[in-house]
Swiss-Prot record:
Protein origin, superkingdom: Bacteria
Keywords: Acyltransferase, Repeat, Transferase
Alphabetical GO biological process terms: mycothiol biosynthetic process
SUPFAM superfamilies named in the record: Acyl-CoA N-acyltransferases (Nat) (SSF55729)
Its biological purpose: Catalyzes the transfer of acetyl from acetyl-CoA to desacetylmycothiol (Cys-GlcN-Ins) to form mycothiol.
Family assignment from sequence similarity: Belongs to the acetyltransferase family. MshD subfamily.
EC number: 2.3.1.189
Enzyme class name: transferase
Identification of the protein by name: Mycothiol acetyltransferase
Amino acid sequence: MKMIETSLASASAALRDRVDEILAAATREDGCAPLSESFLNGLRRADDGHVHSCVMDSHDQVVGVAARDGDSAEVVVDPAFRRQGYGSFLIRHVVSQGVKNVWAHGDGAGAKAVAKALQLEQTRQLLVMAVEGDRLVESAQLQVPSGFRVLALNEAYESIPDIEQQWLRVNNEAFEWHPEQGGWDSARLAQARDTQWFRESDVLFLIDTAKRTVAGFHWTKRHGDLAEGADGEVYVVGLGSAYRRRGLGDLLIRMGLHHLEYEHARRVILYVEGDNESARRAYDALGFHVVESHVTYSPQSSS
């Protein structure tokens, strides 16, 4: 099979358009997007440093793409060209380049079959959970305890000059263990905010009014026009270490649900690790239920 390796951020418009066609076709076929947000950004941002391997058919038409970032990759094949070995070819290639985790969004039958054929094992599961209807309205009810107030980022700038530094502090306390979300600095935060969907009014902070410090935050996301039926998302929620074990985690979630429901969201989704049983129980109690599963497959470790 023929393949070209490039960065699509600097590739020709024709190649980028062809990849966009493949992504759209796969989304229609599978019911979920084949690439995550970070890998979608990597298609357009050269500074992200992603490498793209494009496999071609006998007529030199690109029919599949593997996006690679460090030891992680995501692979998509045009539905019209599946079950012809292109996906397996791309996965073998990225694994040969040091990739240890290949994402399968939706984890459909095709992905399971390829993983089995290549003797890859599931190493991580990321669930999408959703709440809608009456349960959303119920869980969006908000009572802020005495001594705290809720401010959106655009409001917080006026009363808390170092709000961004406090945001980073709480984020890094909350996600010290997390490979992607932890250890952020100002540049990483600026990069995360550099998206078309970012709104300062959608980042909510729980403020300890006596200390004028951030106790926690809830960064929400809109997947389009909420009034037109687009999903809202519990994007990132973080609680500072000094405020743990005080029952504030539930409040932080409700802050975002309250905001999104007020903004006319009909459904709110979130992502949670499949093995995080305590978080899943908390989300179950708020009416969330599993709607999608995303997994990573990895080469079997030798023992």
